[in-house]
Swiss-Prot record:
Protein name (database record): Elongation factor Ts
UniProt family annotation: Belongs to the EF-Ts family.
Region annotation Involved in Mg(2+) ion dislocation from EF-Tu: where it falls in the sequence: 80-83
Localization per Swiss-Prot or TrEMBL: Cytoplasm
UniProt cross-references to Pfam families, sorted A to Z: EF_TS
Length: 291
């Protein structure tokens, strides 16, 4: 029996989209021959999925599932927004989120191999790809844990184009939901200004200093102006300092404090962020249709 290397498993997964264990089993059966392994997987009903693996899945939905003190936020992609609105696609997203929250996998490799339905998460994704005829991809997830006295809040914008998950220490579920809505709408980068990395702050201060100098401000007041602008920058990227979307007369921190709580953390997924979408040339597209 040939030794199966990690690089072979990765290559087969890249070409077919199957899970780690399915790829390894196919390689073992084919004595390490990747092309034979692909054929074997196709014979098991994965051919259609394998042929679509070079397509870009940049649409889709994000969702949240809560299981006791554990919450999972996940993203599942499709090639078109039409498929993302399909009930089967929505059911897959829901099942994946619930499975992740319940089983708490350590990483994507472990998540893909979790039992779900009649197979695994990975096989369920491949099966739906074959049924719908469009590449489906389970892209990412994040797990969040809370204590008994904490509260989770989630909010889905536009049906799941943006998903936010917030954890409050104290307060209540309604407050957590409202803060999650704020996170979806305003997109803060950090919980508090203390969380902003020093290098980010130093860079911003340097840029603002040069900007202020170029405005011709008197040298003696430049430091004060810069610090004012730095504070404005921090208030724009820090959740606690942002004006609360439902009441701009108070900050998010003030709103949560009024509910006897504080913000512990948040996660925000925007569908397709970081994925380079394929742009078709219009002339090439027309020519392709008339060939």
């Amino acid at each position: 029996m040939a030794e199966i290397k990690a690089a072979q498993v990765m290559e087969l997964r890249k070409k077919t989209g199957v899970g780690i264990m399915d790829a390894k089993k196919a390689l073992v059966a084919s004595d390490g021959n990747v092309e034979e392994a692909i054929d074997a997987l196709r014979e098991k009903g994965m051919a259609k999925a394998a042929k679509k693996n070079d397509r870009i899945a940049a649409e889709g939905l994000a969702g949240v599932a809560i299981d006791g003190n554990t919450a999972a936020i996940v993203e599942v992609n499709s090639e078109t927004d039409f498929v993302a609105s399909n009930d089967q696609f929505k059911a897959l997203l829901k099942d994946i989120a619930e499975t992740i929250a319940k089983n708490k996998p350590a990483d994507m490799a472990a998540a893909e191999e979790l039992p779900m339905g009649e197979g695994t998460i990975a096989s369920s994704v491949i099966n739906l790809t074959a049924v719908i005829g469009e590449k489906i991809s389970f892209r990412r997830f994040e797990l969040v844990e809370k204590n008994d006295g904490d509260h989770f809040g989630s909010y889905l914008h536009n049906g799941g184009q943006i998903a936010s998950l917030v954890t409050l220490e104290g307060a209540d579920d309604e407050a957590a939901h409202d803060v999650a809505m704020h996170v979806s709408a305003v997109n803060p980068q950090y919980v508090s200004r203390e969380d902003v990395p020093a290098e980010t702050l130093d860079h911003e201060r340097e840029v603002l200093t040069e900007e202020t100098k170029n405005e011709g401000k008197p040298e003696n007041i430049i430091p004060k102006i810069v610090e004012g602008r730095v504070n404005k920058f921090l208030s724009e990227i820090s959740l606690n300092d942002q004006a609360f979307i439902k009441d701009s007369d108070q900050t998010v921190a003030q709103f949560v404090a009024s509910k006897n709580g504080s913000v512990k953390g948040f996660v925000r997924f925007t569908v397709g962020e970081g994925i380079e979408k394929k742009e078709n040339n219009f002339v090439d597209e027309v020519m392709g249709q008339i060939k």
